UniProtKB/Swiss-Prot annotation:
<dbReference type="GO" id="GO:0009767">
    <property type="term" value="P:photosynthetic electron transport chain"/>
</dbReference>
<dbReference type="GO" id="GO:0009535">
    <property type="term" value="C:chloroplast thylakoid membrane"/>
</dbReference>
<comment type="function">
    <text>Component of the cytochrome b6-f complex, which mediates electron transfer between photosystem II (PSII) and photosystem I (PSI), cyclic electron flow around PSI, and state transitions.</text>
</comment>
<comment type="similarity">
    <text>Belongs to the cytochrome b family. PetD subfamily.</text>
</comment>
<dbReference type="GO" id="GO:0009534">
    <property type="term" value="C:chloroplast thylakoid"/>
</dbReference>
<dbReference type="InterPro" id="IPR005870">
    <property type="entry name" value="Cyt_b6/f_cplx_suIV"/>
</dbReference>
<keyword id="KW-0249">Electron transport</keyword>
<keyword id="KW-0813">Transport</keyword>
<keyword id="KW-1133">Transmembrane helix</keyword>
<keyword id="KW-0934">Plastid</keyword>
<dbReference type="GO" id="GO:0009507">
    <property type="term" value="C:chloroplast"/>
</dbReference>
<dbReference type="GO" id="GO:0045156">
    <property type="term" value="F:electron transporter, transferring electrons within the cyclic electron transport pathway of photosynthesis activity"/>
</dbReference>
<dbReference type="GO" id="GO:0009536">
    <property type="term" value="C:plastid"/>
</dbReference>
<dbReference type="InterPro" id="IPR005798">
    <property type="entry name" value="Cyt_b/b6_C"/>
</dbReference>
<keyword id="KW-0472">Membrane</keyword>
<keyword id="KW-0793">Thylakoid</keyword>
<dbReference type="InterPro" id="IPR036150">
    <property type="entry name" value="Cyt_b/b6_C_sf"/>
</dbReference>
């Protein structure tokens, strides 16, 4: 942990600078009105102009039209729904699968209350939150990769 050096307010050079208004906030320019009125709108409008320009010049293709007579063998959701899809696919009771899905955000909501006595922001000094994050990330990756495989290899990822 570093040592913070406090200014010596009895130093005559520092007192002279503070008297002139040259304190810690002397360098730079203020955010109001320069940034908020002039720079931010230019950046926002420039970003919108780039997006509109790319959409006009290079429109993305929607894809081939749907054929109701050619249904794929296995319908997969979007990639960000793979872990949830895997839970619903592997749990035999659908009500239990829905309860498992609801328990994930409910469990995440309890983590701040478990560590409310710990005021550190460093993740290595917050073991409960770090453990929940690491286990949750590993489980989401495991379920997400398993959702892309056939049902008989989905839980073992074809490794065992």
């Amino acid at each position: 942990m570093g040592v913070t050096k406090k200014p010596d307010l009895n130093d005559p050079v520092l007192r002279a600078k503070l008297a002139k208004g040259m304190g810690h906030n002397y360098y730079g320019e203020p955010a109001w009105p320069n940034d908020l009125l002039y720079i931010f709108p230019v950046v926002i409008l420039g970003t919108i102009a780039c997006n509109v320009g790319l959409a006009v010049l290079e429109p993305s293709m929607i894809g081939e039209p749907a054929d109701p007579f050619a249904t794929p063998l296995e319908i997969l959701p979007e990639w960000y729904f793979f872990p949830v899809f895997q839970i619903l696919r592997t749990v035999p009771n659908k009500l239990l699968g829905v309860l498992l899905m609801v328990s994930v955000p409910a469990g995440l909501l309890t983590v701040p209350f478990l560590e409310n006595v710990n005021k550190f922001q460093n993740p290595f000094r917050r073991p409960v939150a770090t453990t929940v994050f690491l286990i949750g990330t590993a489980a989401a990756l495991w379920l997400g990769i398993g959702a892309t495989l056939p049902i008989d290899k989905s839980l073992t990822l074809g490794l065992f």
